[in-house]
Amino acid sequence: MSRRRRAKKRIISQDPIYNSTLASKVINKILLNGKKTLAQYIFYETMKNIQEIYKKDPLDILRKAIKNASPQMETRKRRIGGTIYQVPVEVKEDRGTSLALKFIIEKARERKGRGISTKLKNEIIDASNNTGEAVKKKEEIHKTAEANKAFSNMKF
């Protein structure tokens, strides 16, 4: 048994411009080397570009992209008798959201082209249209979980 206490879930403050905790989560995921103002600039520039294209609330498009890129199942490793099994488990909503954000930002950074805000905009638009690399990553995780469905009876 662990002697440490379970970490309390931190409350994320709302974004000052969009009044949304989702926007704050995206900014915190973009964040590199503690440069939060740069991360905020990238996010707001991305949202402005999406607003210009679709002429509607960019947070709705972001929510749709996150919904399309968040996995419902994933595999976790479990060691039983010297053998490590990939056990499929359901993903909770918060973890699904953070995984989707991770996939979208990771795949946006891998894209070719100039300017992270442009690459992030394109990845968000692709994910909202159910295409793009982030959605492919989600489908890949689902395939892995489906392949290991035989081990789903092992409790985690």
From Swiss-Prot:
<dbReference type="GO" id="GO:0019843">
    <property type="term" value="F:rRNA binding"/>
</dbReference>
<dbReference type="InterPro" id="IPR000235">
    <property type="entry name" value="Ribosomal_uS7"/>
</dbReference>
<dbReference type="InterPro" id="IPR005717">
    <property type="entry name" value="Ribosomal_uS7_bac/org-type"/>
</dbReference>
<dbReference type="InterPro" id="IPR023798">
    <property type="entry name" value="Ribosomal_uS7_dom"/>
</dbReference>
<keyword id="KW-0689">Ribosomal protein</keyword>
<protein>
    <recommendedName>
        <fullName>Small ribosomal subunit protein uS7c</fullName>
    </recommendedName>
</protein>
<dbReference type="InterPro" id="IPR020606">
    <property type="entry name" value="Ribosomal_uS7_CS"/>
</dbReference>
<dbReference type="InterPro" id="IPR036823">
    <property type="entry name" value="Ribosomal_uS7_dom_sf"/>
</dbReference>
<dbReference type="GO" id="GO:0015935">
    <property type="term" value="C:small ribosomal subunit"/>
</dbReference>
<keyword id="KW-0150">Chloroplast</keyword>
<comment type="subunit">
    <text>Part of the 30S ribosomal subunit.</text>
</comment>
<keyword id="KW-0934">Plastid</keyword>
<dbReference type="GO" id="GO:0009507">
    <property type="term" value="C:chloroplast"/>
</dbReference>
<comment type="similarity">
    <text>Belongs to the universal ribosomal protein uS7 family.</text>
</comment>
<dbReference type="GO" id="GO:0003735">
    <property type="term" value="F:structural constituent of ribosome"/>
</dbReference>
<dbReference type="Pfam" id="PF00177">
    <property type="entry name" value="Ribosomal_S7"/>
</dbReference>
<keyword id="KW-0694">RNA-binding</keyword>
<keyword id="KW-0699">rRNA-binding</keyword>
<comment type="function">
    <text>One of the primary rRNA binding proteins, it binds directly to 16S rRNA where it nucleates assembly of the head domain of the 30S subunit.</text>
</comment>
<dbReference type="GO" id="GO:0006412">
    <property type="term" value="P:translation"/>
</dbReference>
<keyword id="KW-0687">Ribonucleoprotein</keyword>
